[in-house]
């Protein structure tokens, strides 16, 4: 990263703290993607907390999408709009749920809690997305690194509770030697 002293010096020399790059991303936006402590410094120096990029994404959107709870909290505490919509019509909460997968479930639950506590609005689509996160997680459960499994499980339970979603049944795989017992009835109900 760029040393704080250099950031301060550049601003003192007249560099526009909100100057966008080709994609409309400001220095604050870029640092929010990385979850860097420089976010706090840029805000203290006057960076525009709500300035979106070319696609309408704010620094809060990308801090959430890249799973940086500490940065999300800082941006919320400094007044970022939790209901700002990007060009796809997604809020930071909708965005983090859209990109959530496997080992990031715990961070997603933490970020979702912060955003909801700050006034972010839930939608029916979010409830459906949480259910899909659960289905995807259960399908891939056996392939998830055991070091992350407990945190992901806890995060998933938190998401289920936050969005009032019935937990997806845990996937049971055959061990290759136990007898297979088939329930009576048509195959769709088994």
Language-model segments: what does each one mean?
Residues 1-3, 30-36, 62-68, 95-106:
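Ankyrin repeat A-helix N-terminal signature
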Residues 13, 33-35, 45, 66, ...:
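Ankyrin-repeat positional consensus site
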Residues 97-190:
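Ankyrin-repeat-protein effector appendages
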Residues 5-6, 37-38, 70-71, 111:
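Conserved ankyrin/ankyrin-like repeat signature
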């Amino acid at each position: 990263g760029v040393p704080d002293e250099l950031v301060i010096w550049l601003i003192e020399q007249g560099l526009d703290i909100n100057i966008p790059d080709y994609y409309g991303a400001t220095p604050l936006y870029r640092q929010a993607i990385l979850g860097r402590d420089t976010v706090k410094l840029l805000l203290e120096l006057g960076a525009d907390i709500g300035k979106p990029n070319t696609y309408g994404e704010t620094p809060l959107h990308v801090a959430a999408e890249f799973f940086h709870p500490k940065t999300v909290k800082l941006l919320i505490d400094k007044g970022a709009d939790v209901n700002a919509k990007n060009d796809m019509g997604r809020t930071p909460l909708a965005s983090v749920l859209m990109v959530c997968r496997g080992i990031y479930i715990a961070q997603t639950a933490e970020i979702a809690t912060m955003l909801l506590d700050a006034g972010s609005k839930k939608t029916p689509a979010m409830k459906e997305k949480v259910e899909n996160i659960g289905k995807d997680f259960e399908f891939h459960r056996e392939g998830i690194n055991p070091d992350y499994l407990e945190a992901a499980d806890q995060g998933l339970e938190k998401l289920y509770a936050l969005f009032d979603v019935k937990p997806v049944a845990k996937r049971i795989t055959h061990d290759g030697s136990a007898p297979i017992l088939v329930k009576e009835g048509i195959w769709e109900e088994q």
